Amino acid sequence: MTTSPGPVHETAATTDDAALTFRGVDHISLTVTDLNVSAKFYTEVLGFTVVLDFGYGLACIHKTTGFTLSLIRHADGTGTRFSQRQTGLDHLGLTARNRAELLGWEQRLRELDVEFTPVRDSELGHHLNFRDPDGIALEFYAPNDRFAAALDELRSRTFSDEDLLDVAEQQLGLGAYVARRSS
């Protein structure tokens, strides 16, 4: 195993798969055609703050959530609009508290002349879809009460993979969609 040198307090990663995990999503980097236009959108519409400017890219922080968004303009980029039908990113989903908050976001998007699809309800919750200036698909999502309760239970303790599938099947009533693998 190769490890890179680091601070003295760091230790080499273990090969014990049970000990290896990640703690959440750290950041996302989006390729854009115009840094200024994209920075304006993400600061004015979603409340990000541009913190670093590398010339070719910007690092933006959302102060409330701590989420980091990088906007990158590649010198040799194609300049074409985003399509979720190509391999890669389908959309970026952002968390909302509930359906009422989504309706508030509808109003904000309307006031800022951002095109959106009205709030839609699904088996697991509610979503509001819109796009950034490059056509990158964005979504605000709020789980319904049943899914929120299941997520709270999942976060409260450790589950085996089989237990996790049981929660999806029983608590959410989504047995037809549960991805059970035959042994």
Where do the protein language model's features map onto the residues?
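A short, sequence-level motif marking secondary-structure junctions
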Residues: 73-77, 144-146
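Core segments of cupin and vicinal oxygen chelate
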Residues: 19-20, 30-75
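Catalytic cores of nucleotide-enabled group-transfer and carboxylate-activating enzymes in metabolic
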Residues: 41, 69, 104-106, 114
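A generic structural signal for short beta-strands and their flanking turns/coil linkers
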Residues: 56, 67, 88-90, 112
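Vicinal oxygen chelate
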Residues: 2-18, 25-33, 80-183
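Short beta-strand/turn micro-motifs at beta-sheet edges
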Residues: 14-18, 77-82
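Alpha-helix termination/capping residues and helix-transition junctions
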Residues: 19-22, 45, 86, 111-113
